[in-house]
Structures are given as structure tokens and as C-alpha cells.
Amino acid sequence: MAEVTVSELAKSVGAPVERILSQMQQAGLTHQSPDDVVSDEEKQKLLTFLKSSHGETVAEPKKITLKRKTTTTLKTGSGSGRKTVNVEVRKKRTYVKRDEVADEIEESAAVAEAEVAKVEEPVVEPVQEPEVAAEPEVVEAPEPEPVVEAIEEAPVEEPAAPAAPVISQTTTASSLVDDAEEMRIRAASARIKAEEERLAAIEKARKEKAAKPAPAPGPAAAAKEDARPTKHVEDLAKLKKPHDKKDEEFDEDGKKHNKKAGKAVKKVAGPKKVASALDYVEDKEEIEEVIHAPKPKRLSANRGPRPVIKVSNKHGFKKPTGKITYDVEIPETITVGELAQRMNVKAGEVVKCLMKMGTMATVNQPIDQETAQLVVEELGHKAVLISADAIEIKLQEEVAANVDGETIPRAPIVTVMGHVDHGKTSLLDYIRKAKVASGEAGGITQHIGAYRVQTSHGELTFLDTPGHAAFTAMRARGAQCTDVVILVVAADDGVMPQTEEAVQHARAAGVPLVVAINKMDKESADPDRVKNELSAKEVIPEDWGGDTQFIEVSAHTGQGIEELLEAVALQAELLELSAPKDVPARGVVVESRMDKGRGVVATVLVQGGDLKSGDILLAGQSFGRVRAMTNEFGEQVKTAGPSSPVEILGLDTPPQAGDEFLVVPDERKAREVAEFRAERERQEKLQRQQAAKLENMFAGIGENETKVLSVVLKTDVRGSLEAIQAALLDIGNDEVQVNIVGGGVGGITGNDVNLALTTGAIVLGFNVRADASARKLAETESIEIRYYSIIYQLIDEVKSALSGMLDPERVEEIVGIAEVRETFRSPKFGQVAGCMVVEGSVHRNKPIRVLRENVVIFEGELESLRRFKDDVSEVRNGTECGIGVKNYDVKVGDQIEVFDVKEVAREL
């Protein structure tokens, strides 16, 4: 070991420098300064002096205690799943010199024999003896076998545990390696201190016990005490024998003892552990000391096999005595797996039951309510049928319970309907005094516009619907949420298909009609023609004895506009429109879109109550808190009353146009209903797909597969998306069809291009554009992106693309006919017919038919065609030729018909 200075030695030992210097001077060393160097021999001399001064002469340590701690993980199963538990195992081993252990055992036996002579009737007397027997602690520490139960040795064992930890806790790892002598010094001083504290505690306990009167022992007690020292000696004699820890670790019930239990309990076998301990020790307070004494360690020399920990394998589950019957709630549709889960059985059991009933089903396949009820009853449970709309009905009842506000008159909601280009938007434009029609793409309206207009006849709310055929659903929605319909018909064009459709929608919704005959400023205007055509549709003018008002107007000159507004106001007055105020709002979603920067924007029409910022709104499968509201002029508003169209922000997804909305008190309920609606739609979709699969399972065998044009469609608003989807799905036929693999509202993103890449689709954007990343990806992967702003162009291009996918039509054309005049045989070609071309021309390489009495009897090809002795490829009308028909013999009078097959492109 390297030489160190006095200050370094004091630092490593943890003692003051002055104290080390004084101890060195007492030991006869000449060190005076902290910087003096201490050699190994001087350290040994100092250590020997310190040990001799404390009554120790042995230089080596009597025992060494090693500690080890390991941490592992254990996975345990529980009712809710598997759980990982951290397990920490702490091991402590004490190594003691064998010769010292033997000496201490003999010394302990001698002490025990001396006690036998001293023990008389006082119970307190044995407490005084532990002060002399200081060494048995070393014996008890290494050997876990129950040794001595007497009170004399229990306090003696207490320093055994602190003695070793003092070494390991107060010395650092570096000092253990660098200087073993310092360790011994520290250990000696700590041992002396612990011994002094122990003796003081025992003296204190003895004095307290001496103050109490001791009961006189009976004859039985005296006999017990006479027998006790012999028991001690026998236990001490067993110290050297290895033992089994099974009796220590587990009691008769199989339960493990507490590790902190004392030796007074552990060392006595049998159920009466504490009672046996009381036989040895009459002092209950000192018994507590024995019980809490540290667990003794086994000697390394006598170390046996690692004890096997017994764990009770008895589980907590008890098999039910009777079958459990569940009340199974069954909605209108439920999957097989979910039904099995509600009955607490395996899904295979439900599938097996369905197979017995003649139904083939998979785990994820939905089944109807009746089938599920039969399965539940078959398996012995009780079926409880619930309505699919139960949760919605409950929510509506809760909302309806709060509708107690007073009703006030409201403005009429007027929908402008009619055929495309008949002037609907221009008429509304004149009323609003704003230029809207000129801003529409292609001059046609492609969205439902909601406007509130202040007129001389009061406030009116107008809905402007598209007139194109693709926007049938929009017109239907407009009629459903309106009070009065203005049917615009061009005076120079008359009644058109969309005009008839608008009449049908108005009748289906039970909404009164006001007919506006537009374009009266044109010279070709013919209002009587319009009246006649509408009369054929059972729309009779008032001046003809009907109940429908016909107003002649012009959107350009303003002719008849005031009369039209007056007619609408009169019709609304007859309806006596009113709505509740100061109640949760309800209404209908007119339009929705995804706006970059603002999120989901929905145009809603409030039909009752007051819609306020911060309300929780539920619309179809969408819900959210209203973050902001704007009117038709783009101004921020805080409240929207009845008949008010507003744009709202804050929904999670764009709702479907036409969905009814209502304000609910709790966001949790709104989320629950929205998720329920989405799940119901998913189940219905799965059911439709499954039905289609079963019906068409064998339909395609032996037939050509249908060609599919895959499309990813993105639009600016939800209404346009629905209209274009409906129009595209109507284009196809049995051979070709459109498959819309993805659709949505908002700009074209990289996800849309990736979807088109994986499905082999083209990307169509209607009034939207692709972002930079999507354009770059599309260019790299050669994905076609097409933009449109007019619905005609989009539908026409998709239709032409589908037409190009159709198989061409094969058309036969007769190019020539030759009559057989004579037949003769040729050694080279066999039978040859001498013919006269009577019509068209005969070609060598075209297919032929042989006709006999104008009936086709053979179809094949020519083997040879000659004019005199020359092979020719064509013989014209009125010319003789020789024809050899391959694999057929012709007769005189037959006709040989030459035809050609041409492919003609088809169109949808």
C-alpha cells in the first residue's frame, strides 16, 4: 500500500487530524505535523495500539459481512390483464472464523451452566447475566438455526446486525481497497460504542424491572426453570449441525412467516411458538426485543442448498355452482363477436350456434336483431331488445324538457328553385342588391346559398339552390327546411326537367308554391305557355281557378319584384310562422366545408331558439363547441335567432348537408350520440356489403369482370361532394363503373395522392387545389390530378373516360358475293369452284360464309383465289375467278359471301 500523510489518513478514517496525531503519540510514533508521511508499518503499529487499548489483541477481523441486492421483474395475471411487478431480493452473508466460533460455543455453554447454579426463584435475576455473555452474538449471526431462547442471549444478539453494517455503511469503497487497517479501526470503535449502548439499555431495563414486585414462582415454575438450562445446552450443542429451514419458513397452514418475526417465535417448532417462548422468558418486554431481533445468517462453511420457497397454488376462483344467466341487450344490428362478449362466451360458440341454425357467419359479421335473439335464447340467456335510436330519443327528450320559452313570430324561409339558367340567382341578386350570379363559376349556382334580406314587407331568409340535375339532393334539402318555395320558370324556355323535379320536392315537403315567370323582358317570352305546361303538372294559376300565385318578373329590369315579395309575404302570413325564443337552438345544416386556417366551417339555418357562441352543438355525426359565428356579410355575431343563417366554427368534422342540429347541455352526451351514429352507419354499411357479397358470389362466374375507374374526389363544400358522387355513380353500366375510393372536403393533400397511388385512381378536384407536397408527389409517381370549376365538365370527362374503357362493338360488313357456276377437282387444292363475282369484290384474306338457298351452312376462309392461272388477292364485280374453300366442298348454285369485321367505339 502506498504511503500517505497523516491528514489523508484522518480523512480516509473520518476522524479529526488532532485526534489521530494524539493517538499516534500515545502509540509511540514521532509524527507531529499533518503533512508527515505514515508508512504501512506505522499504520499497523497504530492499529495494534488501538486494539490493545480497547481490549482486543486479534489483528484480523472475526467476521466479514457481505451484502447483495438484485432487482428483477415478475409478470402476474389479474382480472384486468397482465401486470409487471418489481421484485427486490436482498442477500446478506456473514463469514466467521471457525476456531473462534467453537471457542464462543464453549464459552456460551459455560455461561449457561453457571446460570443454572445461580437461578433460583426470582424471575428478574436472569436479566442481569447478559452483560457478561458478550460473545454469543457472533455465534447467532451466521447460523439461522434456533439456538438459545433464554433472555440472556437475546439482547446479546442485537449488536450482531449493527456491527457488520457499521463497517459497510461508514466506509467507502475506495477506503476498503486502499486501507484495510482504517476499516479495522472504525469497526473496533463502532463495536465498542454499540456494546456500551447495549449494556446501558440492559441496565436500564433491569432497573425498571427491579422496581416492580416479582410474583413468587410456584412449584411448576421452579421445575420449568430447573429444566431450562439443560435445554440451552442441548440447543448450543446443535449449532454446528446443518438444519432445514422449512419449519422456520412455513407454518402448518402453508403461510409464510413474517421475515421480521423474532427468533423466540421461529426457533420453537409447532403451533405454540409464542407460548414456548414465554416458557423461557418471563419478561414480555424483552420478548418483544427477541421477536424483533435481526434474522441470523447461515455460516458460509455450513451453507446448504438454497431453500425452496413454497407458494400456495390454491387460486381464488371458485367454480360457480349454477349456470349464470345474463340479460343481453340486443340492438337492431350487432356483430357476432360483440354478442359473444355480452353473453360472456367464446365467439366460436356463437358461430357454432348460428351454423346449427343454418346461418354461416364470421366473428366480425353483423347479424340482425331477430337472429341474435334466437342465439341468445338458444344459449340459455335472456334477450333484451333495445331500439337503435334509444340513446338519441333519450337526448331529445332531455333537450325537449328545457323548451319552455315563449314563442315569437319569425321570418319566413324562402327557397328559390327551378331549372338551370332560368335566372334564380339573378332574381335573388336583384332582391339582395348584390352581384352574386356573375361570380358563380360558369354562371351557375353550385352551392346552397343562405341570405337574409330586409325588404319593405319585412325580413326574409332566402335559400338559393342549384338547378343542375346533379343537385337533386340539395333541392330536396332546400324544400325540407323551407316555408315557401319560389319556382322560377323562364318565359322563353318553359317547363324543364328540373322544374318538374322542384314541383315534386315542394309537394313532398308540403310547402306552398309561388311561381315567378322570369325573363319577361325578352321578346320571345310566352307566359301562357308556362301556365299551360304547369297546369299539366297540376299547378293551377289563381286566375285560372287554382291556388298558386303566378307573378311575371324580370331579374334585369326589376319588373314584378315587389309583387313577388308581396306574394311571398302574404303566403307566409297565412302560415302564421312562430318559433320559441330563449331556449336551446335547433335547426338544419345547409352546407359545410373544410377551410384551411379555420377548420370546419358549417352554414346552418336556425329554426328555433337562440344559437350562442360557446354552445355545444350536435349535428349528425359531428359535434363541437361553437367558437365563432358570422352572418352572410362576414360580420361576427354572438347570437343567432330563429330563421337566421350563420356560419359557425368549432365542429370536429364537416357534417352532412341536411343534417339537423341541436344544442345539447353536455359535451359528453354529444360525443356519445355522435359516436353512436357513426357506429350505426358503419354497421349498416357492413351489412349492405355482406348482403352484396352473398348475392353476387356466383354471379361473376363465367363472365368478364366489370371494369372500374377509381377516383379520389375532393370538393370545396359537402353539398357539392354529395352531388358529384351521386352523378358519377349513376354514369356506369354493367361493364364499366366509377369507384370513388376516397372523397372529402378541402384541398388535395399528400394523403390523397398516396391513396390514389395505392388504388390506381385519378384525383379530381372541384374548386380546390393541391398543395406543394401533393403536387410534387403526384409528379414523381405520375399520378394525374385534374381540376374543375364547372360540374358539367367534370361529369363529361369522367363519362368519356368510362366510354374509352368499354369494349368496342364488332360490326360485320359484306364486301362481296360470288356465285358458284361450276366445280372441278385440282390435284393440288382438291375441289375448286368456278365462280362469278356478282356483287362487290372478293378478297383473299377475309372470312367467308357459304350460303345454300340463302341459308348459312358454313363459315370459314378461302384457301386460294385465282384469276385464270394467276394467284390474286382481290377479284372485282363481274369477273370470273376460281375459289378454293378450305375444308369444305361447295356445290353448283351456292353463294360465297365475303365479309369484314370492323370495331366501332362505344359510348355511354
Curated annotation (Swiss-Prot):
Pfam families, per the entry: EF-G_D2, GTP_EFTU, IF-2, IF2_assoc, IF2_N
Region (G2): 443-447
Primary location class: cytoplasm
Keyword Electron transport: no
GO MF annotations in UniProt: GTP binding; GTPase activity; translation initiation factor activity
Domain of life: Bacteria
Region (Disordered): 122-180, 203-267
The entry's keywords: Cytoplasm, GTP-binding, Initiation factor, Nucleotide-binding, Protein biosynthesis
Bias kind Acidic residues: ranges: 132-143
Stretch list, region G5: 554-556
Gene Ontology, cellular component aspect: cytosol
Residues covered by the tr-type G domain: 409-578
Compositionally biased spans, kind Low complexity: 157-166
Entry-linked NCBIfam families: IF-2, small_GTP
HAMAP family xref list: IF_2_B
Protein name as catalogued: Translation initiation factor IF-2
